[in-house]
């Protein structure tokens, strides 16, 4: 449980889901939010809002301590923010077109994905605020954490879509909900069917053959959480 593990680091004592729901919620909010550059004030406000759990009230100093702990515990994540921001800046200069970083390829104002699609930043340019681009009828500001969120969501979507295509060969894929795939099946052996589905969902893509994938599931006559 990564939420409890990080909460244990923050509170300097063992935290578990059953006995420490408030502390674990702090860990969950940190893991889900701080990975994309959320700062102390936004973290404090998110905890107080209690949208995903019980409202928790931190001082700004306490919130900053959690942010600092996250960034020092997972040093590779801030490094990724900087790397992806630099990669997006490369899209502004044609001498960089074709540069590759992992599954991403640099092109004009966009980062090309391994499935042939791309993250487009129309009219990307520098401003006094930093990197900005045109989005519909407004100008959007972007930075390392937000670019990282764009990339992670896009790559994750490719992975789950690949799983859907594999599963659709044997079953009827009805819909998806976030990272869930819901299928209908007439197979009379639901346990074996579920085992096969989980196996198919854990097949890594060729462009990230060492990515650690895992899945779990269940079955019923109707969809429920």
PLM regions: where:
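Conserved catalytic core of nucleotide polymerization and phosphodiester-bond processing enzymes
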Residues: 1-225
């Amino acid at each position: 449980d990564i939420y409890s593990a990080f909460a244990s680091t923050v509170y300097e004592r063992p935290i578990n889901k059953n006995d420490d729901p408030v502390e674990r919620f702090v860990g969950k909010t940190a893991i889900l939010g701080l990975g994309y550059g959320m700062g102390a004030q936004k973290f404090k406000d998110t905890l107080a809002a209690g949208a995903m759990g019980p409202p928790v009230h931190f001082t700004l100093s306490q919130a900053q301590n959690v942010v600092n702990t996250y960034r020092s515990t997972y040093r590779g994540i801030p490094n990724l923010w900087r790397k992806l921001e630099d990669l997006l800046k490369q899209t502004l200069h044609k001498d960089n077109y074709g540069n590759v970083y992992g599954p991403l390829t640099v092109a004009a104002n966009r980062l090309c994905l391994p499935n042939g699609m791309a993250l487009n930043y129309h009219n990307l340019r520098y401003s006094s605020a930093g990197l900005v681009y045109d989005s519909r009828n407004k100008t959007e500001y972007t930075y390392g954490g937000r670019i990282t969120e764009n990339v992670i969501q896009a790559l994750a979507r490719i992975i789950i879509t690949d799983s859907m295509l594999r599963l659709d060969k044997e079953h009827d894929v009805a819909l998806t909900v976030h990272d869930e795939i819901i299928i209908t099946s007439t197979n009379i052996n639901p346990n074996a069917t579920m085992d096969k589905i989980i196996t198919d969902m854990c097949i890594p893509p060729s462009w990230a053959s060492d990515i650690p994938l895992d899945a779990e599931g269940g079955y019923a006559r109707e969809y429920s959480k």
